[in-house]
């Protein structure tokens, strides 16, 4: 039960932060200047303004295991780059610490997610059949 509570708390916080990226689409002066300061093109702001909220929705919906893997990976890459950008840009720990906290919550959400929200691994027999079909098991 505790694992389920930890999962939902971390996931809701992560999803809320990802949904907040909708502000990237408004052309908010603070967001635009932040992307400019980092040297990133404004088109990245638009892409993230669409991708992050989409990831939030996928994380909250049941099923969609493969899309969830992509959502977790995309959020990790985006926040990893944000962490590096803020740290190397001279922003203080108040700024990059928040991004680091979101990355930790993302990992907690990923690790504690229920089996119904995980990608089912390929069975070994399928992998063996694929190797045989591709000819990698053939003897010289």
Q: Which residue stretches match the model-derived regions?
A:
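Membrane-interface extramembranous regions
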Residues: 1-140
